[in-house]
Design a protein with these regions (language model features):
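Two-metal-ion RNase H-like nuclease active-site motif
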Residues: 52-65
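Short, basic alpha-helical nucleic acid-contact segments in DNA-binding proteins
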Residues: 9, 24-25, 32-54
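DNA-recognition alpha helix
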Residues: 10-23
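Mobile genetic element proteins and their domesticated derivatives, centered on retroelements
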Residues: 14, 30, 59, 75, ...
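Short conserved beta-strand segments at catalytic cores or DNA/RNA-binding microdomains
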Residues: 5-8, 66-82, 92, 100
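Active-site beta-loop-alpha junctions of metal-dependent nucleic acid enzymes
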Residues: 32, 36, 85-107
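C-terminal domain-tail junction helix/linker
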Residues: 158, 167-217
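RNase H-like two-metal-ion nuclease catalytic core shared by retroviral integrases
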Residues: 138-154, 166-168
Length: 217
């Protein structure tokens, strides 16, 4: 599951890598693991997440699903932490409003400043959800989030497209979670002298911590 969320690998490649290690499963099993365990790992990590910043860059990109495009609303804070992602079949005020409401609920932070492009959906959405936030629009201000989109688009490009919105949401959530875990936005995976993982990078140590937490639950 970690390989799938971290690297640009299809399910069939994960199956092959597991087979090399003596684990024989089919692609549907890997798919089921990703859908089932991704929310569990995210929930287990939640108490260890660094607090999200109050300066948000928000934008939408698109991913392929069942032969059509759907919109991925995303936000990062001033430190580069992925705040949230919300998938929608529409690109309108209702979708933007739902995104802001979800992002605030999940992060438990209300932004002081939000930068967006000039899409007409954002001002009414912000007035409805976080009217106290300062709103800035402009191309320069959006460069960071537009660059950040490439991580998600690169990951989804190696797939053959999603079939259901809910399944796509889990994978996009997991991708952002994995980015944050690797980049140190959780108090997990810090060096602890564990002889089993003396040279392991932060992500592997953090994943090991979470796996032990879930196993003990």
């Amino acid at each position: 599951m970690r390989w799938y969320l971290r690297f640009r690998l299809p399910y069939t490649d994960i199956v092959e890598l597991l087979a090399e290690r003596g684990v024989h499963v089919d692609a549907s099993s890997v798919y089921d693991w990703v859908q089932h365990f991704t929310p569990l790992y995210k929930d287990a990590a939640r108490p260890h997440r660094h607090r999200v910043g109050t300066r948000w860059a928000v934008d939408e990109t698109y991913i392929r699903m069942a032969g059509r495009w759907v919109y991925a609303y995303r936000a990062i804070d001033e430190h580069g932490q992925v705040i949230d992602v919300y998938l929608s079949a529409t690109r309108d005020t209702a979708a933007a409003t739902a995104f802001f409401a979800q992002a605030i609920a999940r992060s438990d932070v209300r932004p002081r400043l939000v930068t967006t492009d000039k899409a007409a959906a954002y001002p009414p959405a912000l007035r409805a959800v976080v009217p106290e936030a300062e709103h800035i629009t402009g191309k320069m201000e959006q460069q960071a989030i537009e660059r950040d989109h490439q991580h998600l688009k690169g990951r989804t490009r190696s797939m053959r497209g999603f079939q259901r919105l809910g399944c796509a949401q889990v994978v996009c959530d997991g991708h952002g979670f994995m980015r944050n875990l690797r980049d140190g936005f959780y108090r997990l995976g810090e060096p602890s002298g564990d002889p089993r993982l003396p040279q392991a990078p932060r992500l592997v140590r953090a994943w090991d911590d979470l796996t032990q937490t879930l196993a003990a639950a």
